Swiss-Prot record:
Motif segment ('HIGH' region): 124-134
Keyword Aminoacyl-tRNA synthetase recorded: yes
One Pfam family named in its UniProt record: tRNA-synt_1d
NCBIfam families: argS
InterPro entries cross-referenced by the UniProt entry: aa-tRNA-synth_I_CS (IPR001412), Arg-tRNA-ligase (IPR001278), Arg-tRNA-synth_N (IPR005148), Arg-tRNA-synth_N_sf (IPR036695), ArgRS_core (IPR035684), DALR_anticod-bd (IPR008909), Rossmann-like_a/b/a_fold (IPR014729), tRNAsynth_Ia_anticodon-bd (IPR009080)
Gene3D superfamilies: Arginyl tRNA synthetase N-terminal domain, HUPs, Isoleucyl-tRNA Synthetase, Domain 1
Species, as recorded: Methanococcus aeolicus (strain ATCC BAA-1280 / DSM 17508 / OCM 812 / Nankai-3)
Protein name: Arginine--tRNA ligase
Claim: Protease is one of the keywords in the record: no
HAMAP family hit by this protein: Arg_tRNA_synth
Record keywords, A-Z: Aminoacyl-tRNA synthetase, ATP-binding, Cytoplasm, Ligase, Nucleotide-binding, Protein biosynthesis
PANTHER family for the chain: ARGININE--TRNA LIGASE, CYTOPLASMIC, ARGINYL-TRNA SYNTHETASE
Catalytic class of the enzyme: ligase
Cited PROSITE patterns: AA_TRNA_LIGASE_I (PS00178)
Length: 574
């Protein structure tokens, strides 16, 4: 509807100005629905061109617009230079709500774009459990994957496995020194070995040479495509940790389509090819290492490509990975911590130097609990597993307090959905570029800002619809719905429900899943006000009863659709 209004508005501006108007027109929403559903200040922008007051221009444009009989618009008013549009809610409700009812979980889905997107997210080093800091990467990445896919793109989620770095060499070194606790979850067991190995290295600095030897031997074996005792140790250590990661991520409804190992680019010769190609650009300098000059891209620091002994570095392997990735997609998206900004700029500059497309990067700031931040290296961190368990335990207490159910299995099932929702939503609702403190009062808030607010609105819809099923009255024909004067709460709910397709598009285009998170909460809060002010079964008018029930059904659908795009399930009761 908005696009139709702006198209007609441009047409009328061109009639009035007798020129082609090619500027963007944005419709705003007035602070109150009583002032209109959409508004534009275009008259103020045209005042200088037409040498008239905005009030006069608004009146002239309004008269021209009224003559068009814009579909779905009941009234157009000029007020103090602004042009306000009022929706015909009886007509708008019939068509819009019918569309949600018929399309259900497909409502809002974008048309196929015939473009492939590769989103790389999580990609934590396999040297210990995923901690709360990793959760922001994984949750933002997975939510974005779901939204972009729903918007019509073919999307592949990748995990880039760092199996060649110093940290993994320390794990392999540690496995030779310490026994792996197989009673622990795999990633936690690996983390314990890594922590002990680090302590040993701190006490015996001369052992650092062993780590360098392990790294060099593993790379040499990879270059030759050899499988030996050492490569088997690395593979075992990495896969063992990854099995724990997958369990953690699966618990949060996060899945990757492909795990790409860093060493694969050494094995296939691509890393050496990248080094040589970059040398051929004449931008590489040699001192104690090989360095790439990226000053033409405004980067003063030189990128270290390789050691003089020929062994590669993470940066070179990262460039090889990105070349491969960008060759196999139309759009690449990386989710990275803000501390990786310079590295990302250097990799992208290297790709440009070689003539390749570059990925878009969504950076996120650090996340912490009120007690402080986390570090895998020190062995003092809060794992995602611990975060989830704490959320679930708190959810169980809340469910029992509300006496919604006494069945232990059902309590656990509902608590799991609330816990996942609490963790995922509390993280995704905050813009990634803002540092955040994870607070339990927000995450498990049933009243204002938490996922439980949205899930509870869904559960309320379910209860209302269960009551409908016990009602003996048969519903009227769908074409006869909304044949009465709708109140403000009904209008606001209809309006926000029908915004869903636009929110999907906006979230996907901006690469901002927090837009969807904010919208889902807005829907829940708008529905709660509707529920408080629009009685259903007490109404005698059959048209009102079934029109309002249809709104409840559609609210349930939209909440399910929105939360699904954030990886959150909706309990039928809470």
């Amino acid at each position: 509807m908005e696009q139709n209004i702006t198209n007609i508005l441009i047409k009328k501006i061109e009639e009035l100005t007798e020129t082609i108007y090619d500027e963007t027109i944005r419709l705003e929403e007035p602070p109150s629905i009583s002032l209109g559903d959409y508004s534009t200040n275009i008259s103020f922008k045209l005042a200088k061109l037409l040498k008239k007051s905005p009030m006069v221009i608004a009146e002239e444009l309004t008269n021209l617009l009224i003559s068009e009989n814009i579909e779905g618009i009941k009234e157009i008013k000029a007020v103090n230079g602004y042009i306000n549009f009022f929706i015909d809610y009886n007509l708008y409700s019939k068509s819009g709500i019918a569309k949600i009812s018929s399309e259900k979980d497909k409502f809002g889905q974008g048309a196929p774009k015939n473009k492939k997107v590769i989103i790389e997210h999580t990609s934590a080093n396999p040297n210990g459990p995923l901690h709360i800091g990793h959760s922001r990467n994984a949750i933002v990445g997975d939510s974005l994957k779901r939204i972009v896919e729903f918007a019509g793109y073919v999307v592949e989620a990748q995990y880039y496995v760092n199996d060649m770095g110093r940290q993994e060499a320390i794990v392999v070194y540690g496995l030779d020194k310490f026994e792996l606790n197989e009673q622990q979850k795999p990633d936690h067991a690996i983390g314990e070995v890594y922590f002990k190995a680090n302590q040993l290295l701190n006490e015996n600095p001369e052992q650092e040479e062993e780590i360098l030897k392990l790294m060099k031997k593993y790379e040499e074996a990879s270059e030759k495509g050899e499988e030996n005792e050492l490569t088997n140790k690395f593979n075992y250590a990495v896969n063992y940790a990854l099995s724990g990661f997958k369990e953690t991520l699966n618990n949060l409804n996060i899945h990757h389509d492909k795990f790409v190992w860093e060493s694969s680019y050494v094995k296939n010769g691509m890393v050496q090819k990248v080094i040589q190609t970059l040398k051929d650009t004449g931008k590489v300098e040699k001192d104690e290492v090989y360095r790439l000059d990226l000053s033409e891209f405004g980067i003063d620091k030189k990128l270290v490509l390789a050691r003089l002994n020929g062994t590669s570095l993470y940066s070179t392997r990262d460039i090889a990975y990105h070349i491969d990735k960008m060759k196999n997609c139309d759009i690449g998206i990386n989710i990275l911590g803000a501390d990786h900004k310079l590295t990302a700029e250097m990799v992208n500059a290297s790709l440009k130097l070689l003539g390749y497309n570059t990925p878009e990067v969504v950076f996120y700031e650090f996340i912490s609990l009120p007690e402080g931040s986390m570090s895998t290296r020190r062995g003092t961190f809060i794992s995602i597993d611990e975060l989830y368990e704490e959320a679930k335990n708190r959810a169980v207490k809340e469910i029992k307090k509300r006496n919604e159910t006494t069945e232990e299995e059902e309590i656990n099932n509902i608590a799991h959905k609330i816990a996942v929702g609490a963790v995922r939503y509390n993280i995704v609702r905050i813009s990634p570029d803002k540092a955040m403190v994870f607070r339990w009062d927000d995450a498990l808030d049933f009243e204002k800002v938490g996922a439980p607010v949205i899930q509870y609105a869904h559960a309320r819809c379910c209860r209302i619809l269960e009551k409908e099923n016990t009602n003996e009255n048969k519903p009227i024909d769908a074409t006869e719905l909304f044949e009465y004067d709708l109140n403000e709460h009904e209008k606001l709910l209809i309006k926000i429900l029908l915004k869903f397709p636009k929110i999907v598009e906006k979230s996907a285009d901006a690469k901002k899943p927090q837009i969807m998170a904010t919208y889902a909460l807005d829907v829940a809060q708008t529905f709660n006000r509707y529920y408080a002010n629009c009685p259903i079964f007490k109404e005698e008018n059959k048209n009102i009863v079934y029109s309002r029930l249809e709104l409840v059904k559609c609210t349930k659908t939209i909440i399910e659709n929105a939360l699904n795009l954030l990886g959150i399930e909706c309990p039928g009761k809470m």
